[in-house]
Amino acid sequence: MEHNFQPLLFGGDINVYSVARAFHEAYGIKSVCYGKFASGPAYRSTIIDYRVCPQNEDAATFRENVAKAAQEFADKTVLVIGCGDSYVKLAAENKQYFPENCIAATVSGELINTLINKEKFYALCDEHGIDHPATVIYDKSMGHDFSLPWGPPYIAKPADSVAYWACGDASLNKVYVCQSWEELLESLDHVYAAGYQDHMVLQEF
């Protein structure tokens, strides 16, 4: 069956594959996907038209790729979907430049930059009385000279995930679940040694 829309995905990990699979299972549609690497779960998938673009996270290149897809599927509504924080951010910040047949179902760039930063997100939760785990914001300058008002296990995750993954260190974890104080300190040292410079969010498990 012919449909009047075309999914356009950005990314290359399991999130992209999962979204593409959902579209394929529901509508029989083959999603177009732009990813940075010729590898990963989405690469060479039979349900994805995967296109390698090393500069995929550059704003100008991102807009060019959207424009190409809009022209290729000129008779359809192109659904621009970022599968990952950096691509969600790009879609939100650039959607005003997209061709008329493109839709990016995101909030404004200003709001996404608040929501995507975990430090700002939890501050917003506090402002509106939304419950969340006990949280301390850690700065690199604190070194090992700090304490937490709760015991292990400790959760540690980057406040700015876009800058975090831009470090390009494959040994970094999305979230650290530390079973001891020593493991927490080692994890923090490892993160900053990898080149990340922003804050870390420490939380009660």
What are these regions (language model features)?
Residues 83-85, 159, 204-205:
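Short, well-ordered beta-to-alpha junction loops that form the rim of enzyme active sites
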Residues 96, 130, 193-197:
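Generic secondary-structure signature for well-ordered alpha-helical cores
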Residues 29-32, 132-133, 200:
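Hydrophobic anchor at the start of a short beta-strand
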Residues 8-9, 79-81, 133-136, 201-203:
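Short catalytic-loop micro-motif centered on adjacent basic/acidic residues
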Residues 178-205:
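Phosphate-binding site of ATP-dependent enzymes
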Residues 1-107, 120, 127, 141-146:
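ATP-binding N-terminal substructure of ATP-dependent carboxylate-amine bond-forming enzymes
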Residues 100-175:
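A conserved helix-loop-beta module that forms one wall/lid of the active-site cleft
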